[in-house]
From Swiss-Prot:
<comment type="similarity">
    <text>Belongs to the RnfG family.</text>
</comment>
<keyword id="KW-0597">Phosphoprotein</keyword>
<keyword id="KW-1133">Transmembrane helix</keyword>
<dbReference type="GO" id="GO:0009055">
    <property type="term" value="F:electron transfer activity"/>
</dbReference>
<feature type="transmembrane region" description="Helical">
    <location>
        <begin position="9"/>
        <end position="29"/>
    </location>
</feature>
<dbReference type="Pfam" id="PF04205">
    <property type="entry name" value="FMN_bind"/>
</dbReference>
<keyword id="KW-1278">Translocase</keyword>
<dbReference type="GO" id="GO:0022900">
    <property type="term" value="P:electron transport chain"/>
</dbReference>
<keyword id="KW-1003">Cell membrane</keyword>
<keyword id="KW-0997">Cell inner membrane</keyword>
<keyword id="KW-0813">Transport</keyword>
<protein>
    <recommendedName>
        <fullName>Ion-translocating oxidoreductase complex subunit G</fullName>
        <ecNumber>7.-.-.-</ecNumber>
    </recommendedName>
</protein>
<keyword id="KW-0288">FMN</keyword>
<comment type="subunit">
    <text>The complex is composed of six subunits: RnfA, RnfB, RnfC, RnfD, RnfE and RnfG.</text>
</comment>
<feature type="modified residue" description="FMN phosphoryl threonine">
    <location>
        <position position="176"/>
    </location>
</feature>
<keyword id="KW-0285">Flavoprotein</keyword>
<keyword id="KW-0472">Membrane</keyword>
Amino acid sequence: MLTIMKKSSLVLALFAIAATSLVMITYALTKDQIAYQQQQQLLSVLNQVVPKEQHDNELFKACTLVNNIDALGTNTPMPIYLASMNGKHTGAAIEAIAPDGYSGAIKIIVGVDSDSIVTGVRVLSHQETPGLGDKIDTRITRWVDGFLGKTVDSADDSSWAVQKDGGQFDQFTGATITPRAVVKAVKRAVWFYKTHQDELQTLPLNCEVK
């Protein structure tokens, strides 16, 4: 009986080793492809929020990590991608969190030019209710295009609110919390850039390039 148990344990151990080895080999063979796909997805989003005619540098390499919970909605350092044309600063793409979405945190990226005018907004991830809050996603509606051409005049700019709160941005029928959260997050990101643009250009480019 003891011999049978030892044999069974040996077989299980060998199986575990083989399975682990297979996982490691698969990861080694696919990690470069996965990293490339992630880089291409990031590049696509960056070019959507910072138009190609606004920069000639590789945005995903011109990246600095910034830790500012008040502006970016999280105490985790967030990437800010600095755009330039012929060596001159022309804007940025700022990743930020709207922590007060209806179903949790909403991750966004905001593009601005050097005059702090919004050139694009995209939602990177969310858990909002399908058919209601998910209208922030460009695959559902183009609601985020309402930010294009806008800027923030002051930290307490009251126009940066949904119409229900006296602002300029549409809310969704039956889902005011979601657009309200995104509007506030975009406003904070734009104002942060507007008041820290010079400082951002002096920070180290310390994001990990995949």
